[in-house]
């Protein structure tokens, strides 16, 4: 029977992480467990940055963006000797189990601790990219989506005033959920997803045809890493004769107070993680599917479950262009 658990946040921050930490801490305390916070992710674990938390440690954090525990990327965790030391540090504090909040890289760390050192870990999906398998939504995605839509709305105001074409680069790495959803909600004329081969010439020809039909401005939503959006803007302007500007939303998408959906999702997932650990279930990750909380083997989430590309959503977006 576990008596002490720890929680850490790892990788890129996401709105709602604080709500998830709060969900873990208060649920665990309600079950009579002691809770420890690990500061700065796996790097902080390696450096023994561990502090006991109480219910007041998570007061007034549910509405705050980021993560008060801090986060850091720690590639050294790939070293089995580093992982062995981390497991030793956890046990030196009497900690019996660990909740890890982050993306697929964070899950891998939890998987290895569970496999190599029989240390029970549960993963919560915390990333704005919505690219974690085994869940319909990740913590932070809905807030980042609203941030992107707000930016698109503002760009449309100025683009329509100046007959300008605006390119908006949206985060997501190799998952275009944010781009497609923001593109539909923002009424973007063109959506360029990473899951489909990008054809610059085809895009420019589409814009040219729109201008011939009398289109005075346009918004192009494009997933990051596909192309240099500033060079694309110059090429479009040279070809179609309309002023074209590129806006990279960047890390602004990660910040801000989490929306109600993310606060509730994170709170529920945090409590569910504690329930799993109390049942002796380590090596799992939590998700939400069809409005129900679920858990999967963390190895499956990393290796076997493929994210479903929103091809039908993109088809709808194309019809609305």
UniProtKB/Swiss-Prot annotation:
GO biological-process terms attached to the record: canonical glycolysis; fructose 1,6-bisphosphate metabolic process; fructose 6-phosphate metabolic process
Required cofactor names: Mg(2+)
Protein name: ATP-dependent 6-phosphofructokinase
UniProt GO cellular component terms: 6-phosphofructokinase complex
Record-listed Mg(2+) binding positions: 104
Regulation: Allosterically activated by ADP and other diphosphonucleosides, and allosterically inhibited by phosphoenolpyruvate.
Reactions this protein catalyses: beta-D-fructose 6-phosphate + ATP = beta-D-fructose 1,6-bisphosphate + ADP + H(+)
